[in-house]
Design a protein with these regions (language model features):
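Alpha-helix C-terminal capping segments
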Residues: 30, 38-48, 289-292
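Short catalytic helix/loop segments, enriched in acidic residues and glycine
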Residues: 20-39
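Conserved phosphate/ATP/ADP-binding segment of small-molecule kinases
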Residues: 171-258
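Positively charged, low-complexity intrinsically disordered leader regions
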Residues: 1-20
Length: 339
């Protein structure tokens, strides 16, 4: 059965290597966006993944579609209109210098989608899962309405729903995010967040934890997950835990709470090649595991391992296989040549 993701995909422009914006004379052009990243990961894992969005009816939109098709993602329900594609500029950090992102996405075709533009009943026919992030309703008031329209249709058709809160302060205020997401999350079966999202969006903070300093208290995050479950009725809450040593080195783990038990993954010490899309690869890994009948603990370990591997891959998309993820989750983190 199909897995549907919905959101905006953008043109990613990045200086080569670790050059800064002020140095760069050339930029590499690729594509990326939260929900598209999830769809590509799932397609790479062998799932029937379909991405729904709005794209400009021009050669840039066509190039984007071709890129998605390259990885086996269905674009049957993509809406194409006259207009522009959102762009984001990415400057990769290193050592103590953090990465930097600049958005140029206002007025994109995706942000301009309206209620009624997408036939959600057709989209969710033969679908088992629907995924979106908090970025999508933040794009515009009408996109918040379209996301709500999608959630209602998915719930009516018995499709399980996941959401990654993905708070972006450059898109909306905490107050507006809390109001809008408070209307959407009650539809969600699996809620995904990072260390700070629950606090930013809903004011639910983990005690004894400091994200900036990389201080993580598991019991504090158990309380966060429990409060989210009780407030919104989610079946599961997953939280990624990133301890930043520097822009080049992070400690990475995650937890999953199912309303009764909390499962905690092993922790990975990562040397980072590209951290963009790390959270999306975690979400894709969870969706894969849960739709394949994994236990909650095994689904979590698969998700964290998939995301760990993504941090070693250039670009938004996670170009790894199920076998590679399973090998790491099973304990093979040596990095030895596979012959």
């Amino acid at each position: 059965m199909k897995i549907i993701t919905f959101g905006e995909i953008m043109l990613r422009l990045q200086p080569f290597g670790f050059e800064r914006f002020v140095q760069a004379r050339e930029y590499e052009a690729t594509f990326g966006g939260g929900e598209a990243n999830v769809a590509v990961s799932l397609a790479n894992f062998g799932k029937d993944a379909s991405f729904v969005t709005g794209l400009p009816d021009n050669d840039i939109g066509k190039a984007c579609l071709q890129e998605l098709h390259r990885y086996g993602v269905s674009t049957e329900f993509v809406v194409q209109k006259s207009g522009r594609m959102g762009i984001y500029y990415c400057e990769k950090g290193a050592s103590q210098r953090p990465s930097k992102v600049i958005y140029d996405r206002a007025g994109s075709v995706a942000a301009g989608l309206q209620v009624g533009d997408i036939d959600w009943k057709a989209v969710f026919a033969d679908a088992e899962w629907f995924h979106f992030t908090g970025i999508t309703p933040a794009l515009s008031d009408n996109m918040a309405e379209v996301t709500l329209e999608a959630c209602k249709a998915a719930k009516e058709m018995g499709v399980r729903i996941s959401c990654d809160l993905n708070y972006r302060k450059k898109l909306w205020s905490k107050e507006k995010a809390g109001k809008v997401m408070g209307q959407l999350v009650p539809f969600v079966d699996l809620l995904i967040a990072n260390e700070a999202d629950a606090d930013d969006v809903f004011g639910i903070k983990a005690a004894k934890s400091d994200v900036t300093k990389g201080e993580i208290d598991l019991e504090g995050y158990r309380s966060v997950a429990k409060q989210l479950t009780e407030r919104f009725g989610c079946n599961m809450v997953a939280i990624t835990l990133r301890e930043s040593v520097s822009a080049s080195r992070n400690l990475w783990s995650g937890l999953l709470y199912d309303g009764e038990s909390m499962f905690v993954s092993k922790k990975y010490d990562m040397q980072i090649v590209d951290r963009v899309g790390g959270g999306d690869s975690f979400g894709a890994g969870l969706i894969y595991g849960l739709t394949e009948g994994y236990t909650p603990k095994d689904a979590l370990e698969f998700a964290v391992a998939a995301s760990c591997l993504k941090h070693s891959v250039e670009g938004d998309f996670n170009m790894v296989t199920v076998g590679e993820v399973q090998a790491l989750a099973g304990g093979d983190g040596s990095g030895r040549v596979q012959r």
